[in-house]
Amino acid sequence: MERRLKTLMDGLTFGEGPRWYQNKFYFSDFYSHKVYALDLNGNYDVIVEVPNQPSGLGWLPDGTMLIVSMKDRKLLSFKDNVLEEMADLSELAGFHCNDMVVDVHGNAYIGNFGFNTYAGEEVKSTNLILVRPGEEPCVAADDLMFPNGTVITEDGKTLIVGETYAAVSYTHLRAHET
């Protein structure tokens, strides 16, 4: 059987934060400030525009979409076509926020650059931020070198965080949260 590649979309500037949710492929295109959804037939829609660049995506148990707003270091919620601030991450993030993973309980784990890469600042460690529904943001893990590519294993017991500037992955065993 011959397989052929088919372009479903072009013109993207920087695709980020890919997630599969309810039979659609969602992702941020952060330089165009848009969040897209692509269906199984190759049709796509702009879901929302985020003024300060979208990055990581996830969902609360009730279906509310969560979006990391990079430049202003905020966690946003998007439901019923309303984009709102859910949490201000700026006190815990050293620079722009980026990737995120959300567990089945709605706990969001959010990475950040830790330093201003564009100004040539020295590489330095930062925090992985945790936002639980209805609570203030807190530090889930510290001393990480640009936490990114975070995933939770299928059984929900292990959080794996890629550290871009350390060239390693950090594994954290999580207790089951209710």
Model feature map: region roles:
Residues 29-39:
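Beta-propeller domains
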Residues 171-178:
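Conserved small/polar residues in nucleotide/adenosyl-binding loops
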Residues 9-22, 50-69, 74, 91-115, ...:
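Beta-rich, blade/repeat-based domains predominating
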Residues 4-8, 43-48, 84-89, 136-141:
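A short beta-strand motif characteristic of beta-propeller blades
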Residues 1-3, 122:
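Blade/loop signatures of beta-propeller domains
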Residues 39-42, 79-82, 132-135:
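Short loop/turn segments that connect beta-strands within beta-propeller blades
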Residues 31, 71, 118-125, 164-165:
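Short, solvent-exposed loop/turn segments at conserved positions within beta-propeller repeat blades
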Residues 34-36, 74-76, 127-129, 168-170:
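A short loop-to-beta-strand structural motif that recurs across blades of beta-propeller domains
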